[in-house]
């Protein structure tokens, strides 16, 4: 695992053992990543799909790229939420097959599928709609430098209705601070 500018974020890669029969990958081992994961998910995304920016207050995520390439954006809003910093910390990175990232509570995350993508992710909580928060992927106050996509006429990503309607980060922060 390698470090990050964001505390608690760790990048790594899983080892692939391949021969003429195929390959084997160990995706997770408790001794290396002792988070109490309780649910595993597999997401598939077509080229040009953007998922995010999503935020959890009670869940750690561990992602492994099973196939394809993603542009990943992480936005640390913890110090913004507690009032100790005026801006979030933004970090981006490309992830390819077998790359992994651990995302702690309070770090928003999203990805753009640069090509067809399979993403395996383990989480520390079962799905809980009350912990499925999000803010606008293109919020200029956050400034994620998303690459343009070539699969749409306007160069913008393909979004879910939820991600298309997420509020600006300032609105989410105001709501969470209550």
Please give the residue ranges for each predicted region.
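Conserved metal-binding segment of the jelly-roll/cupin
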Residues: 94-115
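Non-catalytic, conserved peripheral segments adjacent to functional cores
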Residues: 1-97, 118-121, 125-130, 135-178
